């Protein structure tokens, strides 16, 4: 009996001891989980604009893939889940940070002007905006060669492995996602879709597909399988390219197999700008990094913080300075011409990062928003209202990071479909419509091989001293730069958590210098800005389509957030 009692006591003590060991080990092996707070990850994360694509990117990382591998896999997925935004018929810009070397590079695979194009193209701009449907607007797709170049330089897993999750998604009974159904049934888009070759993909008889309807897309599944097995060249110099060109020629396209074969992505150095304790790395023209850098460079001189904004009138004062800075920024968009086709632009765009220019702009900002004519800001008054695009942010276990923005331009691009390849074509040449130099009444014609200007700003901010990193970018056409700039301000200057920084309603300044407010934007701030002479746009856009995806690393903690405006959800571990 005594022996049995002693044995029981020993077993209890052994159990308690083992429990303590487990607790201690858990505390030693995973101290970060407790200190980082709920919702944080401790190793890596992916933020795409849908949960399923974020999960696919995370799975690639867990299979020991590189951040570039994860970004490619998530982008391939997004081309299926949100085909209105991006796909193989579009273009992509990567900003890539290598933690082992500390180097950042840009891979620009944005679409180019084909060798032959409609010579009267730019004369059509006023009549086709904002959508720009039709084969005459198609640029040479660069998406897939962009993936191939990024994978060649930074990939770790086999190429085919990056496509398998999305192929399985298509083969196993894919259904229409909610966000796609919203676009398909949009009152503006629906008539154009019905009249286009996309009708065969997105309509069931006379009705558009609804959320959770079966969505068979065998042509794209076949294309992805072929690309997975044979590589990107099958689209650029092989049979898929020939099929694509033949399909869209029937719809008026002038794109040729020679255009596809000639396309090459560019690998260039990023724009680099100090921002407090961070360094901002962003893509140079024709992408929009120079404009984003200009905005933040001007605003950082006003030293806005949570404390200054909390003072009476502080929030209105910050947004007033933001609005005035955005007016100047919109007036500088002409600097985003492609420097490869217009060499004189390169230095002009880099001037936007100069501190003396930022200081001069600050001195021109006073307490009123109605003291100056449009010419003071170089504003043209030409309204754009462009929208579209998708973004993925990735942080790997070693601290390497990728920000990748991809697009077919406006929703559903040119609304031109290749039924044999399953590819939707871009309408990227529409972006040439706002290539205007305020000092000249003449806009030079497009140059074959030229990349149109873009608002895409896949960016990485690095604070090496504190081990912090913000990987960020967005979608929403002309709203991208406004949304990304305000998210960075919210996070780094005002101390918002990442989800709140992204979710906060934004404002935007159009080319008339008028302010557009996202629904639910603070009414008191709106009133305060009006009292300062800021003019609210009378033609409010029907919907704000801005969507930011970001990953933030702070020491051992990793936070990731995808924009709920597009029903996004990040994933990590």
Curated annotation (Swiss-Prot):
Activity modulation notes: Inhibited by serine-borate.
Subcellular location, record wording: Membrane
Record key words, sorted: Acyltransferase, Glutathione biosynthesis, Glycoprotein, Hydrolase, Leukotriene biosynthesis, Membrane, Protease, Signal-anchor, Transferase, Transmembrane, Transmembrane helix, Zymogen
Binding-site residues, L-glutamate: 110, 407, 428, 454-455
Post-translational modifications reported in the UniProt record: Cleaved by autocatalysis into a large and a small subunit.
Pfam families on file: G_glu_transpept
Name the record gives this protein: Glutathione hydrolase 5 proenzyme
Gene source species: Mus musculus (Mouse)
Phylogenetic lineage: Eukaryota, Metazoa, Chordata, Craniata, Vertebrata
Gene coding for it: Ggt5
